[in-house]
Amino acid sequence: MLKMESTQQMASSIINTSFEAAVVAATSTLELMGIQYDYNEIYTRVKSKFDYVMDDSGVKNNLLGKAATIDQALNGKFGSVMRNKNWMTDSRTVAKLDEDVNKLRMMLSSKGIDQKMRVLNACFSVKRIPGKSSSVIKCTRLMKDKIERGAVEVDDSFVEEKMEVDTVDWKSRYDQLERRFESLKQRVNEKYTTWVQKAKKVNENMYSLQNVISQQQNQIADLQNYCSKLEADLQNKVGSLVSSVEWYLKSMELPDEVKTDIEQQLNSIDTISPINAIDDLEILIRNLIHDYDRTFLMFKGLLRQCNYEYAYE
């Protein structure tokens, strides 16, 4: 007992099976060609293209629509069947179908499929024999109709005709490939030579830069040695200066408090860092000048109190 939509389900199943067959054909072809592929990507691409072609061409809707018409007829509803019958026998429909056929023929011709190829494909088909390399050529109904109409001629005469076979001049092809290879080889050699020259120049610049850096490092080392020696000399000079002043101070007839104060200032001089030592010496000299100035003022005041005058000679 057929269901209400059994024909539509069968048509939908055929469409889905066609899609699966397209996926299998695509993947098997890639495997035979030795091309690695992603099955999910192939499945997605084929499905997208298949759905677009079936929907855009109207084939899917046409098949499902005819299946729906058959289901309606099986369920006793012949209205859609009669409309389709009237549409198929209408002169405008026939003219439209004839126009579509002509368009398809012109499209095939533009793709290089000429009339001979179209007629032969329409008149013959090839049946493969399982397990054998040979095959059987079958005549289609169109070929049978042509034979019945006398539209088929058999030429028994032997006519030697040159077969229109696309021959390949392998020697010229080989020469062409050899020239391309030599040209490519020359370009590669030129690029390699240019790269080698650039690499040599880079190496020369690098060696030159290394020499400059080495010279600068040597100069820096010499300056560091000179600075170290100069610093040591200054330390010795400062130490000698402090010792000489201390010795000289002890030979003076100054009060012990003054000697002690000056010795403390001498001992506070940094003999390790010449820069700090110079600052300490500056402070010591300033203090001595200040003390000398105070002593001079006291002496000047004392002379005035004694009604004496002073003069430098």
From Swiss-Prot:
Residues 166-237 form a coiled coil. InterPro entries: NSP3_N_rotavirus (IPR042519), NSP3_sf (IPR036082), Rotavirus_NSP3 (IPR002873). Keywords: Coiled coil, Host cytoplasm, Host-virus interaction, RNA-binding, Translation regulation. It is found in: Host cytoplasm. It holds the Pfam family Rota_NSP3. Residues 1-149 are annotated as: RNA-binding. Residues 208-313 are annotated as: Interaction with host EIF4G1. This is Non-structural protein 3.
